[in-house]
């Protein structure tokens, strides 16, 4: 199963090896994880994107690790690949999950539970196979947008316009590649974010997000 490592008395232990935490072990193929403060109170849970099995969402409850994915409306079965969390469409932490052989998920935080609104916001991208994803303020307007890399397909740069995400990606950024991971940050401290795209069997790519959403 997964491992949940904790430091106790200068010793690292796997909390899932403790019997009381073994009720909800994840016995499917995990692909990506993200920590989510779903209530905004400083307490984090762990969203686990699985391949061919239901999503998990682990939290500590009464000193026991419990999977709350069912009660939080997250227990979907898909080809999970990548996941990010942040203030995407609500004033709390939302979740975007990029999937393979199925639609992406965009979970809007609804008072600590989640509602998949990927179809309404046009980010399902059902014909593509998601691999790596990151959040970035593409227009430098103080809100998070979605960068999504698709395996052998067109990469996306989703920006929110009139309550719908529009893909503004253009060549060479959107050109298909055997992508594995996407990260975004101001790597050279010049005030503009970069996007690093990690590919397999071909060169990696590094882009810069300039003014007006230009990625080059």
Predicted feature descriptions by range:
Residues 1, 40-49, 90-98, 140-149, ...:
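Acidic/hydrophobic-patterned starts of short beta strands in beta-sheet-rich repeat architectures
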Residues 1, 51-53, 61, 100-102, ...:
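Short loop/turn segments that connect beta-strands within the blades of beta-propeller domains
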Residues 3-28, 45-47, 58-78, 94-96, ...:
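Blade-edge motifs of beta-propeller repeat domains
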Residues 18, 39-40, 52-54, 89-90, ...:
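Short acidic/polar capping segments at secondary-structure boundaries
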Residues 29, 53, 79-81, 102, ...:
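Beta-rich catalytic cores
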Residues 30-40, 80-93, 130-140, 144, ...:
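Beta-propeller blade termini
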Residues 34-36, 48-50, 57-60, 97-98, ...:
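Residue-level detection of beta-strand scaffold positions
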